[in-house]
Regions:
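Bacterial N-terminal signal peptides that target proteins for export
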Residues: 2-17
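Short, linear, compositionally biased motifs with a strong N-terminal bias
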Residues: 20-23
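N-terminal signal peptide c-region/cleavage motif recognized by signal peptidases
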Residues: 26-28
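N-terminal amphipathic/hydrophobic interface segments
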Residues: 30-156
């Protein structure tokens, strides 16, 4: 068996893998892609609802909205429904209202505000009133109004 000199340089495959990893890390964190495919569920201690298309439901006491890894909690909520009785929008208030979601990388986003207005169609949550959001690896933001895109994890 012949011995050959070994190079200290990483192989081309290793260099490409490192480059690819670096490019992936430069991309913005994306919210769970499969969350949007999950049904939106809301629970509470009590509720009052209309029996008409394009109606609404008022929830009271320990309100919890979930859709995949997305979770919104609060004391009170109003859910707006379309003609098929699917949830299109939920406004949650609490002391404070809380939102959290895990992105595809496993990073947790958490936020609190006096009110969270979640648009299930546009996948946007607007936190209003002493709003605070923390995203692992991306820092935190505070303000009177913060907008969080649950599809892209972008905060404005």
């Amino acid at each position: 068996m012949m011995s050959t000199a070994r190079s200290c340089l990483p192989s081309r495959a290793v260099r490409l893998a490192i480059l690819g990893l670096g490019l992936v890390m430069l991309q913005p964190a994306l919210a769970r892609k499969d969350d949007r495919q999950q049904p939106a569920n809301i629970s509470a201690k009590s509720f009052d609802a209309t029996q008409q298309a394009n109606g609404f439901v008022h929830y009271k006491g320990s309100v919890v909205l979930t859709q995949g890894t997305l979770k919104v909690t609060g004391a009170l909520a109003t859910a707006y429904l379309d003609a098929d009785n699917s949830v299109t929008r939920v406004v949650v208030t609490g002391s404070p209202a809380h939102i959290e979601q895990v992105d595809d990388s496993g990073n947790l986003m958490q936020g609190n505000a006096a009110s969270i207005d979640y648009d299930n169609v546009k996948q946007i949550a607007v936190l209003t009133g002493n709003a605070w959001v923390k995203q692992k690896g991306r820092g935190e933001a505070r303000g009177d109004k913060l907008t969080y895109n649950t599809q892209t994890s972008q905060m404005t």
